[in-house]
């Protein structure tokens, strides 16, 4: 699911940008 989510995140990066630090922490 990570690839699909990452792709979605990439397309909507501007929308989730505020959560980017959290996303990276979660990814780690």
Swiss-Prot record:
Give the GO molecular function terms.
acetylcholine receptor inhibitor activity; toxin activity
Gene Ontology terms: cellular component: extracellular region; host cell postsynaptic membrane
Instruction: Indicate the principal place this protein occupies in or around the cell.
Output: secreted
Sorted UniProt keywords: Acetylcholine receptor inhibiting toxin, Neurotoxin, Postsynaptic neurotoxin, Secreted, Toxin
So which tissues is this one expressed in?
Answer: Expressed by the venom duct.
Summarize the protein's role. Potent inhibitor of human alpha-3-beta-2 nAChRs (IC(50)=566.2 nM). Irreversibly inhibits the acetylcholine-induced response on human alpha-7/CHRNA7 (55% inhibition at 5.6 uM) and alpha-3-beta-2/CHRNA3-CHRNB2 (91% inhibition) nAChRs.
Protein name (Swiss-Prot/TrEMBL) = Turritoxin F21-2
- Source organism per entry reads Polystira nobilis (Sea snail)
